[in-house]
Amino acid sequence: MKRTSGDRAFSLTVLLPFAVAIGYLHYSKDVPFKCFIYGSGSWGFGCILKLVLYHGVVRRLRHDPSRILGTAALNGLVSGITELGFALVFFAFLPVLTFWEVVAFGVGIGTIEAFVGATTANPLKGTALEKSADELEAMVGRLSGGPRLVYGYILPFSERVIAAVIHIGTRGLVYVAYHSANPLPLVMALAAFFLADGIIGYRLIHQGRLCDLRALNKTYAGLSAIAVIVLAGFLLYWPEGGYG
């Protein structure tokens, strides 16, 4: 399905809440812009390593349908280890951050990811998920009226916000794990990637099950639940006085 100019213009509106969040954190919470840059930088380095490992390991297993669950789990682990690993590296070299600076770190990741998604026809191009993603987009393109509005615009818009919340929660958990020497928050963050990028994301897209609207609804519900859990975990683990 080819995107119209209206589709492309609407896709860029997903950046508006991120612009508001960045402005709020910078001007109301005195968060320096470099915190957003650090976050997006950690995501970029993590994605580079993730793509190398994906093409070197995960993609070699994609042709065996009987291994899809294991392949999906491996993809989730690779995604979590690379992205969270680079966040951990950044946190190890950065000075102690405030709560809002850690939040900004995650917002920076959500912003750059949303920008890539809004400006790329198919972010999964060149992967084993490219065909399934194209089929999903074509299916949504055949919808009209209310369903087209919901599945073509509202839910994809919501997905970027949900993903940003997951990034904020997981990076917050990684930060807490590093400064408290408690591995449980890190395990929780890794489990979120295992489920979101692996069991839910990779497996369902690879099997083409997201073309079923009921499965698509369950996917968004599952991702929303993960976002709530990791954000709640970050808030609960964060000490009242911070780490300053």
Positions of the model-derived regions?
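Hydrophobic alpha-helical segments at protein termini of multi-pass membrane proteins
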Residues: 1-244
